[in-house]
UniProtKB/Swiss-Prot annotation:
Keyword annotations from UniProtKB, A to Z: Electron transport, Flavoprotein, FMN, Transport
Pfam families reported for this sequence: Flavodoxin_1
Role of this protein: Low-potential electron donor to a number of redox enzymes.
Gene3D superfamilies, per the entry: 3.40.50.360
Originating species: Maridesulfovibrio salexigens (strain ATCC 14822 / DSM 2638 / NCIMB 8403 / VKM B-1763)
Protein name: Flavodoxin
One term of GO molecular function: FMN binding
This protein's record includes keyword Flavoprotein: yes
Source domain of life: Bacteria
InterPro entries, alphabetized: Flav_short, Flavdoxin-like, Flavodoxin, Flavodoxin/NO_synth, Flavodoxin_CS, Flavoprotein-like_sf
Needed co-factor(s): FMN
């Protein structure tokens, strides 16, 4: 059985809800899921026997890209994670009225690619409140690529 880790940072609860929907999609595909708030994860956990690691982070800020506050320490130390060759995927919530819609998703994905991680599927950028069907469908597509 494949094993996955979903790490999320959430301020208003939207990204946490999205992470739960992704977990639901993975469980429907009989993939073992660990769902963790970013505050409960260290970089050492990320390469720890998982077939895929998913990162969920909301975007804040109007003038520049701002990651969700709790996610920043993990993002800043991500280079220390053993993710070379590891399958990863990224999702997040944002607001398309802002200049950098879901910029955190792009920033995380770019950093992971530079580290040699293998990004599978397109990232998911959620505009506003998460919609279950859209997210479960995306998660199922990612799960099929493991």
């Amino acid at each position: 059985m494949s094993k996955s880790l979903i790490v999320y940072g959430s301020t208003t609860g939207n990204t946490e809800t999205a992470a739960e929907y992704v977990a639901e999609a993975f469980e429907n595909k009989e993939i073992d899921v660990e769902l963790k708030n970013v505050t409960d994860v260290s970089v050492a956990d990320l390469g720890n026997g998982y077939d895929i690691v998913l990162f969920g982070c909301s975007t804040w800020g109007e003038e520049e890209i701002e990651l969700q506050d709790d996610f920043i320490p993990l993002y800043d130390s991500l280079e220390n994670a053993d993710l070379k060759g590891k399958k990863v995927s990224v999702f997040g919530c944002g607001d398309s009225d802002y200049t950098y819609f879901c910029g955190a998703v792009d920033a995380i994905e770019e950093k992971l690619e530079k580290m040699g991680a293998v990004v599978i599927g397109d990232s998911l950028k959620i505009d506003g409140d998460p919609e279950r069907d859209e997210i479960v469908s995306w998660g199922s597509g990612i799960a099929d690529k493991i």
